[in-house]
Every structure is written in C-alpha cells, then in structure tokens.
Swiss-Prot record:
Keywords assigned: Hydrolase, Lipid A biosynthesis, Lipid biosynthesis, Lipid metabolism, Metal-binding, Zinc
Active site (record annotation): 265
Gene Ontology biological process: lipid A biosynthetic process
GO molecular function annotations of the record: metal ion binding; UDP-3-O-acyl-N-acetylglucosamine deacetylase activity
E.C. number: 3.5.1.108
Name of the protein: UDP-3-O-acyl-N-acetylglucosamine deacetylase
Residue runs in coiled coils: none
Species whose genome carries this gene: Shewanella pealeana (strain ATCC 700345 / ANG-SQ1)
Major enzyme class: hydrolase
Family (UniProt): Belongs to the LpxC family.
UniProt catalytic activity: a UDP-3-O-[(3R)-3-hydroxyacyl]-N-acetyl-alpha-D-glucosamine + H2O = a UDP-3-O-[(3R)-3-hydroxyacyl]-alpha-D-glucosamine + acetate
Residues where Zn(2+) binds: 79, 238, 242
A Pfam family that the UniProt record links to this protein: LpxC
NCBIfam families for this protein: lpxC
Length: 306
C-alpha cells in the first residue's frame, strides 16, 4: 500500500517576510492521518487556524494567500506547499507568527532541506490521490491552464516574457513528476522580479523583505544578481514550482497532466476550484501496490508507522 506521510518530529526555522520585511518564525509539526495541511497564526490570541483548501485562497496578487472569513491571512504559502507536495507530505500543522510564510531564499529548497532534516514518516493509512478522469480547462485572455487524464503526474508549462534575458532562456518545459526530479530540477528555482516593479512595490510598503538574497532581480536587459542563475531555465522552472504549490491546496497529489500557458497564482487557483466543482471529472483513488502507483515519491529512510 502507498501510505500517507507526515514529518517525524517538529521542526522550526526563522526567516524574513517578503512583504513586511519582519522576522517570521515557522514551525512544522506532525499531524494524524487524514488531517491534511493546516496553518495556524500563533501571533494572534487566541491562535487562528486556517485550513489549506482551495476556497480559502482569496488573494493571488504576487503570491498565494489564505484568508478566512474574518480577514485573517497567511500569505506566500506556495513555496512551502511545493516542498510539501514534492516530498509527498499529506498531513502537517504549520504554525507561523506573522501574516506570511518566510520567503527564505525565494525557492522551495530551504523547506525541502527542513523537512528532510527531521525525516518523513509513513502513517498507517492509505494515501489518497485525485485522479483526473475528464479534461478541466480555465482561460483568461491568452492565458490558460488545464488538467487532463494521464497515468502519472506530468507538467507541460510555457511562459512568454518579452525580456531579453528570459527570451534567451528556455521558456517551455515538460517534466514527469517524481520527488527526485522535483528536488533536483525544480526546488532550487527562485522567484524573479523586475527592478522597476520592486521600486514601485517598496514605495507602496510592499516587498520590503525582497532582495537579491531571495529573488532573481532583472533590470531592462539582464539579471542583476552577481551569481547569476541557478538553472539556465530558472524562470520557467520557478513558475512550475509555484504551480506545484498552488495545486496542492486541492488537498491531495494529482494523477493527471497539468498543461499551462502564462499562468500565475490566480489561474492556478481558478483551475483547482473548477476541478473540485466538476465532480464527474475526477475521483479519489489509493494504491495497494507501490508498483501500481503512477506518481513516485522518495522512500523515507527507515519509515516507521505512526
């Protein structure tokens, strides 16, 4: 059987909030089977829990933010969620003492390291997958995103930026998902932004924590970071990383093909909502034999049932 997963023990880190520029403490705790991913604002009294589900995503400008009915928010969840999805973690409680997840280095890699440092524990319940049985598509002008039936999880993603540095890079990528492919090829890709936008955002009290330490920064012609890019195609890879995180608010790993052109957080969430609403287009499945599982996650060392 393919089992559900959580972290073996609590793990804690600190970082900077992208928009506030303030110090943020993040704690990831194990959770029982069928908990899903829950986020908790511990800086509020009493603490406020926000479930990581698609209809709680109520802000998608520059990041993915969960917002409850009282307006309590947790922003910039997508890189952490990409790491959780990439390592196949089904159940966890995420505590944060600020309105945003720390940006770390602008990629998912620090979260992958954090999760791997404490280990992943298999639990005594079957892992659930969302298997796509009919195509679901959403569009916004020339942008579109689609989920289609596929035995596995494949991503076919294209971006189109009219910028000389990005245009020189590969702007289209197809990959068959596995934990190892995610960690090696996707997880280190950083968010990117343009100097002109950063100046405007800072003037409006946003992106106060943004820097070349946690983003690829471009002017009109080139990358400004002294160390350059981590991957030649880092731009499209980061958009894929974002999509992994955005799709994980569906609640389970997806068995299907995700195809997208020029999508961002808003359209990714729109696609998840459209999928969940179209209940004849998917089904929940589990797999008795590992050989039958179409999506490959890294095997935790010395897995112990919880």
């Amino acid at each position: 059987m393919i089992f559900q997963r959580t972290v073996k023990e609590m793990v804690k880190t600190t970082g900077v909030g992208l928009h506030s520029g303030n110090k943020v403490t993040l704690i990831i705790k194990p959770a029982p089977v069928n908990t899903g991913i829950k986020l908790v604002r511990t800086d509020l009294s009493p603490a406020v829990e926000i479930p990581a589900v698609a209809d709680q995503v109520r802000e998608t400008t520059m990041c993915t933010a969960l917002v409850n009915d009282d307006g309590v928010r947790i922003s910039t969840i997508e890189h952490l969620f990409a790491a959780l999805a990439g390592l196949g973690i089904d159940n966890a409680v995420i505590e944060v003492d600020a309105p945003e997840i720390p940006i770390m280095d602008g990629s998912a890699s620090p979260f992958v390291f954090l999760l791997q440092s404490v280990g992943i524990q298999e639990q005594n319940a079957a892992k659930k997958y969302i298997k796509i049985t009919k195509p679901i598509r959403v569009e916004d002008g020339d942008k579109w995103a689609e989920l289609k039936p596929f035995k596995g999880f494949r991503v076919d993603f294209a971006i189109d930026f009219n910028h000389p540095e990005i245009a020189r890079s590969q702007q289209h990528m197809v990959m068959d998902f596995s934990s190892s492919a995610f960690i090696k090829d996707i997880s280190r890709a950083r968010t990117f932004g343009f100097m002109r936008d950063i100046e405007y955002l800072r003037a409006n009290n946003l992106a106060l924590g943004g820097s070349m330490e946690n983003a690829v920064v471009l002017d009109e012609y080139r990358v400004l970071n002294p160390d350059g890019l981590r991957y030649e195609d880092e731009f499209v890879k980061h958009k894929i990383l974002d999509a992994f995180g955005d799709l994980y608010v569906a609640g389970h790993a997806i068995v299907g093909e995700f195809c997208a052109y020029k999508t961002g957080h808003a359209l990714n969430n729109q696609l998840v909502r459209a999928m969940l609403a179209q209940q004849d287009a998917w089904e929940i499945v589990s797999f008795e034999k590992e050989a039958d599982a179409p999506v490959s996650f890294s095997v935790p060392a010395g897995a112990v049932f919880a």
